[in-house]
């Protein structure tokens, strides 16, 4: 069966993404010994990340994270909105909205129906 275009397996979308600091810390760092004093390991790492540079331009660093979450909820990519069908495919859970009636129309409860049992009791 051919891959559906994704570079990662389907189940990786259900796992949490590891933070970049954790993945960088796991890899061994090779430093050339040129006689210069090495910089502290965590001093400039956060300011050199492209995400943090972008958020500094916007202003509040937490603002970009909040806007990303809002975008995910609006586009329906949130995992809360997905369910897995019996075939294993992801389906979007859709909420049914109550339709709004025009002002001139009455709801079925308010309309005068001749076969309405509640009307006879009055």
Curated annotation (Swiss-Prot):
Annotated InterPro entries: PRR15 (IPR028237)
Polar residues bias (residue ranges): 46-56
Chain intervals for the UniProt region annotation (Disordered): 1-122
Tissue expression per record: Exhibits a cell type specific expression pattern only in the small and large intestine and in the testis. Along the intestinal tract expression is restricted to the non-proliferating epithelial cells surrounding the villi and no expression is found in the intestinal crypts, where proliferation occurs. In the testis, it is detected only in post-mitotic secondary spermatocytes.
Bias (Acidic residues) ranges: 110-122
Compositionally biased spans, kind Basic and acidic residues: 63-76
Database matches in Pfam families: ATAD4 (PF15321)
Cystine crosslinks: none
Keyword vocabulary terms for this entry: Developmental protein, Phosphoprotein
This protein's record includes keyword Phosphoprotein: yes
Residues modified to Phosphoserine: 39
Bias-annotated ranges (Basic residues): 80-97
Domain of life of the native organism: Eukaryota
The protein's role, per its UniProt record: May have a role in proliferation and/or differentiation.
Sequence similarity: Belongs to the PRR15 family.
The protein, known as: Proline-rich protein 15
Source species: Mus musculus (Mouse)
